[in-house]
């Protein structure tokens, strides 16, 4: 281990030890400034799997909130009070990190564009590998040299609103209906 990295590692461990001693919870604001440099060395396949995991995690949180809000019972809270309660109970337990605008934007995006989200989920379930399965689509690294792409008039005829079911995917096509995947994931651009 190099001297410089060993010193920095020791410093980081001391900081972590202090956090554990004071039992300070990690705050959601820490994720806004999170250093993601460690992702730069990962392959496209690993990054794609991380994206799948993140989307599945978001789906679970949104499903919990929907289940709570639609179950029968006394919902005496309303407005911001209800939003804070649901956030604390189902999303993150530190109310001081509550950001109403971000939470409303996330929930609104998932609830209003549920068709695109459901389509994306069907692709994700289809793309995840299963034991002894031949259907796992390999993620290929990008080509290292430049190549000019010719204009393809057939692409103009493709509607961005078309929905392709996983069973209709042409697994031998190099693009594998990427345009349909892009239309299904367009809601993520809100973030």
Swiss-Prot record:
Q: Any further remarks?
A: The sequences of the gene BABR proteins are nearly identical, differing only at their carboxyl ends.
In Swiss-Prot or TrEMBL terms, this protein is called Gene BABR protein 1
Recorded source organism is Babesia bovis
């Amino acid at each position: 281990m190099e001297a410089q990295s060993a010193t920095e590692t020791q410093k980081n461990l001391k900081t972590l030890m202090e956090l554990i001693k004071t039992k300070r919870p990690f705050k959601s604001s820490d994720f806004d400034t999170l250093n993601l440099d460690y992702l730069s060395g990962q392959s496209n396949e690993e990054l794609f799997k991380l994206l799948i995991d993140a989307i599945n995690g978001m789906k679970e949180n949104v499903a919990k909130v929907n289940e709570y809000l639609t179950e029968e019972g006394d919902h005496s809270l309303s407005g911001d009070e209800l939003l804070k309660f649901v956030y604390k109970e189902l999303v993150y337990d530190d109310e001081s990190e509550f950001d109403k605008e971000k939470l409303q934007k996330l929930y609104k995006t998932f609830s209003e564009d549920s068709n695109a989200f459901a389509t994306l989920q069907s692709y994700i379930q289809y793309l995840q590998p299963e034991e002894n399965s031949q259907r796992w689509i390999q993620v290929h690294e990008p080509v290292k040299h430049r190549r000019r792409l010719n204009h393809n008039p057939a692409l103009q005829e493709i509607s961005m609103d078309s929905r392709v079911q996983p069973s209709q995917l042409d697994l031998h096509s190099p693009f594998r209906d990427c345009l349909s995947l892009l239309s299904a994931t367009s809601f993520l651009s809100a973030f």
